[in-house]
Amino acid sequence: MESSAKRKMDPDNPDEGPSSKVPRPETPVTKATTFLQTMLRKEVNSQLSLGDPLFPELAEESLKTFEQVTEDCNENPEKDVLTELGDILAQAVNHAGIDSSSTGPTLTTHSCSVSSAPLNKPTPTSVAVTNTPLPGASATPELSPRKKPRKTTRPFKVIIKPPVPPAPIMLPLIKQEDIKPEPDFTIQYRNKIIDTAGCIVISDSEEEQGEEVETRGATASSPSTGSGTPRVTSPTHPLSQMNHPPLPDPLGRPDEDSSSSSSSSCSSASDSESESEEMKCSSGGGASVTSSHHGRGGFGGAASSSLLSCGHQSSGGASTGPRKKKSKRISELDNEKVRNIMKDKNTPFCTPNVQTRRGRVKIDEVSRMFRHTNRSLEYKNLPFMIPSMHQVLEEAIKVCKTMQVNNKGIQIIYTRNHEVKNEVDQVRCRLGSMCNLALSTPFLMEHTMPVTHPPDVAQRTADACNDGVKAVWNLKELHTHQLCPRSSDYRNMIIHAATPVDLLGALNLCLPLMQKFPKQVMVRIFSTNQGGFMLPIYETAAKAYAVGQFEKPTETPPEDLDTLSLAIEAAIQDLRNKSQ
């Protein structure tokens, strides 16, 4: 060993100059340290092209593991281990799709691992990138100027994990034999199959146009027990295949638009009557048909359903029909109309061919007045003679002199004017605080068609009255008509008093209304038979009033007389003093 020998120039590190020191023997630790330092310097001076699309893809036969690269470098001294290893690393990173923006100081992968172990004992972890093409050589900084060199002095570990391809979605194959033809759409009603051409598809109003109407399949498949409930079986055809012309309703449902609502603001019965008729159906029994359709077609190409309904829903399930507009509140007074009862009993009404127009109706136009309509006979003023206040008071005084008013009463009739109604309500409130009164709620009067009886009918009736009770009982003179009854829009109210005191007191509250509204309010006295009071609780008060007129008033105690005389004397004395 010569002491003056100089170390040769390191081709991998040209910055290092010749040294006069004697080279030390290389140990495995020294070799590993030198390898790491050289690798770090190589990384600083060079640049890895990560994810550059300029790398060409190689065939799978050119892929090499870490051991193959080491053996190849040992056989060929011209090849550098670091260069070959760097090419493999760059190729793996490029195949994994990692670019410089996503790389940090530490990259993680399962295919390549670089450690500080000696070169003669390679680690068991090797570079094995399966099904990953390797690029040829690492790119230079000129080819990818966006890459920046990594400046670090620590050993690093690069682990690259190739992307996992998405798992293919396996769709089951449908055999042609498995596709069965869909059954036809049938409706069975009362053990009879109804042709679908007679069905009317009813959808909701503006809210559900263009949308699908969803109905539960349980409603369609549930068995119907009633005789009037139809049964639906296997509805599968789309609505686009059921474009049949609409036919009349086989159940005889009345037309909802045939009747007009009343324009009277006070006669709420006429306004709400047309809406109540829409909610009713014929008495032949309710029926509901629900059919759901699968597949494309119908409204907007989506799965849709159709609904045919009339009457009430079956008690087996919930209502699945289209929502209807809520009707106005119908009072008990409106439901008890004679016209509504006649309609419920299926009484036929004759519809005269008359011209309907606004304005007054003459007395002789009976057919126009009693046509089949829901409107009331409207009157701005009362259509009959109104008695004067003096006549009403004279009749009341004549009744009160008899000391019994159980067969008399007060009737108040007023129009639908808003101001009149407010005044009448105030009087009703005051009447409710009085004693011994029976008050009725306001009610309507319904009128039928007028007719003039021939002379022979009048003669038979007069003869029966002359013959006595038996002849009148056997008299059968019932003259009917087929026109619709009409109700007037004015209101009626009855007041029944127990004693003359209460009758005159109630009359004093009602007569000012007649004086304030002479054409809109009428008060009159009516008579009944010798029946009792509305309730027997008033009989004691009525008898006490009759007996009280003949009883002498109780005498005033002496002390009260003395006190009264003293008060009179004191008052006289005061007057004398003032006069002086």
From Swiss-Prot:
A motif (SUMO-interacting motif 1/SIM2) lies at residues 410-413. It comes from the Viruses. GO terms for biological process: DNA-templated viral transcription; regulation of DNA-templated transcription; symbiont-mediated perturbation of host cell cycle G0/G1 transition checkpoint; symbiont-mediated perturbation of host cell cycle G1/S transition checkpoint. One of its GO terms (molecular function) is metal ion binding. Phosphorylated by host CK2 at Ser-203 and Ser-205; leading to enhanced SUMOylation. SUMOylated; SUMOylation is enhanced when IE2 is phosphorylated by host CK2. The sumoylation is necessary for efficient replication of the virus and thus for the function of this viral transcription factor. GO terms for cellular component: host cell nucleus. Residues 1-30, 99-161, 206-336 are annotated as: Disordered. A motif (SUMO-interacting motif 1/SIM3) lies at residues 501-504. The keyword Ubl conjugation applies. Keywords: Activator, DNA-binding, Early protein, G0/G1 host cell cycle checkpoint dysregulation by virus, G1/S host cell cycle checkpoint dysregulation by virus, Host nucleus, Host-virus interaction, Isopeptide bond, Metal-binding, Modulation of host cell cycle by virus, Phosphoprotein, Transcription, Transcription regulation, Ubl conjugation. Pfam families: Herpes_IE1, Herpes_IE2_3. Interacts with host SUMO-modified form of TATA-binding protein (TBP)-associated factor 12/TAF12 in a SIM-dependent manner; this interaction increases the transactivation activity of IE2. Interacts with host CHAF1A. Interacts with several components of the host transcriptional machinery including TBP, TF2B and CREB1. Interacts with host DNA replication licensing factor MCM3. Interacts with host PLSCR1; this interaction inhibits IE2 transactivating activity. Belongs to the HHV-5 IE2 protein family. This is Viral transcription factor IE2. The gene is UL122.
